[in-house]
């Protein structure tokens, strides 16, 4: 899959809450850097974190606003909205830096405006 497609597919899969398909997109040694958490290394650790995040936000949907790509790296500007498990509305805006290696996502780093919810 070309890098441009995998960057979009990552968010499509997240919106569908398809953990199995997300695992197919990740390199076995994928790294995730997320505000207020320690770095996570390895596909299993990343997927475990995503599962926890999805439980905290039973409704959460991302909309890609723009993608700035340079080779196997991209900065994806997004907005999101949803509801947390206490049924409180949630919305945010941010950028996710993604990098691929051998056709799989190997690096994810999130930056967003509102970190108070975490």
PLM region spans:
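A short hydrophobic beta-strand element
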Residues: 72-80
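Short, cysteine-centered beta-strand-loop-beta hairpins and adjacent loop/turn segments enriched
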Residues: 82-91
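Short, surface-exposed coil-to-beta transition loops
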Residues: 61-62, 77, 90-96
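Hydrophobic beta-strand positions in extracellular immunoglobulin-like domains
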Residues: 80-82, 100
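Short, well-ordered alpha-helical segments enriched in acidic and aromatic residues
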Residues: 16-29, 33
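Amphipathic alpha-helical repeat scaffolds
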Residues: 8-12
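Short beta-strand edge/turn micro-motifs at domain boundaries
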Residues: 93, 97-116
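A solvent-exposed, acidic/Ser-Thr-rich amphipathic alpha-helical stretch
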Residues: 28-70
């Amino acid at each position: 899959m070309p890098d441009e497609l995998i960057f979009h597919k990552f968010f499509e899969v997240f919106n569908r809450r398809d953990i199995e398909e997300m695992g197919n997109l990740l390199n076995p040694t994928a790294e995730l850097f997320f505000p207020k958490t320690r770095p996570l290394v390895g596909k299993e650790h990343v997927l475990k974190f995503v599962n926890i995040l999805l439980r905290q936000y039973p409704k959460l949907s991302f909309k890609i606003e723009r993608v700035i790509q340079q080779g196997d790296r991209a900065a994806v500007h997004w907005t999101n909205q949803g509801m947390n498990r206490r049924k409180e509305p949630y919305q945010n805006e941010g950028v996710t830096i993604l990098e691929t290696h051998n056709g799989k996502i190997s690096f994810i780093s999130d930056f967003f405006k509102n970190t108070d919810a975490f």
